[in-house]
A protein has these predicted regions:
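Glycine-rich beta-alpha loop elements in corrinoid/cobalamin-binding modules
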Residues: 1-52
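Generic secondary-structure boundary/loop-capping signal
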Residues: 32-33, 55, 96-97
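Short, charged low-complexity intrinsically disordered segments located at boundaries
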Residues: 42-54, 107, 156-162
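N-terminal export/ancillary region detector
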Residues: 48, 56-60, 65
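Radical SAM [4Fe-4S] cluster-binding motif and immediate context
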Residues: 61-182
Length: 182
């Protein structure tokens, strides 16, 4: 059983949910893309005028209070991709909000979290990588984009080389001509 389910970008929906749960006054509570129980019925609320945060504003994940060395590594199933995702620990980041391509017929490109393409600057991404390495001691990164932008991947790689940091990183891609042997 769940009391609330939020959809898509999570920062603002979770912030509003926190405010709603902590609310002690009788004022209209605002939600963003949230399912909840109201009068014994599941209802969808999207009654805020606030906009989602820009990707450059969301900051770096903070794992400082987690005992990362106490977590077990679990391989979910024999699928090699699931093994890659689950075996060991990967710091998770996003290169871009939305999709740079936006033309796949299997994807619902009408959804804001897909159609509103907003890449993060390579410098900011590598800053975040360095913060996570310092915090977690782990230098493996999984960029969780559905399809990472090739031009941005190149910029990130060049920024990593420029800073002389040693990392392992991977992401999902769309195969296209912009990829070179370089």
């Amino acid at each position: 059983f769940f009391d609330f389910i939020t959809l898509d970008d999570g920062e603002l929906p979770v912030e509003l949910l926190f405010e709603a749960v902590c609310q002690t006054e009788l004022v209209e509570v605002q939600f963003k893309r949230t399912f909840l129980i109201e009068n014994n019925q599941v209802v969808y609320k999207n009654n805020t005028t606030r906009h989602d945060y820009k990707q450059a504003e969301v900051g770096t994940p903070d794992y400082s209070d987690l005992l990362l060395d106490k977590y077990i590594s679990v391989i979910e199933i024999a699928n090699p991709m699931h093994s890659l995702w689950s075996d060991g620990r990967w710091n998770k980041l996003t290169m871009a909000h939305g999709c740079y391509w936006g033309k796949c017929t299997f994807c619902d490109i009408s959804l804001d979290y897909i159609k509103l393409y907003e890449p993060i600057a390579a410098k900011i991404l590598v800053d975040r990588m360095e913060e996570l390495i310092a915090q977690t001691g782990e230098n493996g990164f999984h960029f969780v984009d559905e399809a990472a932008p090739p031009a941005l991947m190149r910029e990130v790689a060049l920024e990593i080389i420029k800073r002389k940091i040693v990392v392992t990183w991977w992401t999902n891609i769309r195969f296209e001509k912009s990829f070179t042997a370089d």
